[in-house]
Amino acid sequence: MRRRKQQPLKTIQAVAPGYVLRFDIPGLPYQEPAFSSIRQRFSGEEDPDVIGIAYLLTGEEYERLLQSEGGRDGGYLEIDIEVKPLADLTNENAETIKCKSLSTKTPRENPCPLPSARYMSLIRGGAAEHKFPAEYQEYLANLPIYTISSWRTEIGRILFLLVWAPIVLPIFGLQAAFGKGGKVPGWIRWLQIRVFKAMWFAHDKVFSPLFGPGDITSEKEKLLRTVSKGS
């Protein structure tokens, strides 16, 4: 919140029962492959309930927050969830709090892309700063991050960014300039969707086969291919 220059009226540590942390929002391959969101836990998933900070914001501050995340028509989807204060988890009669949170409209899954070390350090740092439970901090510490493990992939990263960064980055500038009141103009959203689809198509069909993936590590890719061949 500090980096967005927002002043919440109140903050509490909270857990969202039945929801898990996911990195299923595609970003910029090779550089910032994924951003986080939350979604309901699927059957068989063992990830812990997501823990975070619940902020009490004014209507104006909330709209500013939405704008900073791409607006209502951006990649995020507003969802209504119920959370419990961490301090009251042992109290079965503790009241739940109704909150707004952000999920993703078009998740990239099977597999989900991995977050960068920079992005993951922000999440881990926030968990440490707010003194989240040690078990949850350990869970975050063990989540994998995207790494470039070969010179071939590094060459692919440089070439990919030379082509796509000058196209993608101005879109975020347009969102900041025209996304007033938490709403992004339709023509910017239209442009963003098509540019990102084209960018990820180029990654999946051209750059990844030639240079290695820009969203998962080579080790994870090998494991997925092995499982696929065995199935």
Short names for language-model regions:
Residues 1-231:
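Glycine-aromatic micro-motifs
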